[in-house]
Amino acid sequence: ACLLSRGLGDVYKRQTLRGDVENIHIGEGSNIQDGSVLHTDPGYPLKVGKNVTVGHMVMLHGCTIGDNSLIGIGAVILNNAKIGKNCLIGAKALITENKEIPDNSLVIGSPGKVVREITEEEKKAIIENTKHYQDNWKRYSKSVF
């Protein structure tokens, strides 16, 4: 089952949410962009926190994403990985199974490595990015529905 919280920012076109064996929960204000795949395995539900941006062509598989994080274009996050709050996961990063990323981390590479703590400016930029997509969804939903 896919559980979308009230106040969802947006789920764009052409992505796949497969909650066929475990639940997928997408938190309030989060956005899932074009071409992303969200899937689970037995024993590995998927949870996306509040106000998360999941970039284009991302693969989330049985993992947990903390509030106010940004997952860059083409990143892959595998079973039982846990991304903390306020994290920035770089484009094309690979987060392997069971990896735990602390709050406020910048992660790049394949496999992904924490390179430093994000700055206050980067935290603000993540929030602004998420707000941009929330505003887009509000505009879009008024014109379509």
Locations of regions flagged by a protein language model:
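Active-site cofactor/substrate anionic-group-binding motifs, chiefly glycine-
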Residues: 24
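Well-ordered beta-strand segments characteristic of repetitive beta-sheet solenoids
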Residues: 10, 28-29
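Glycine-rich hexapeptide-repeat left-handed beta-helix
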Residues: 20, 28, 34-36, 40, ...
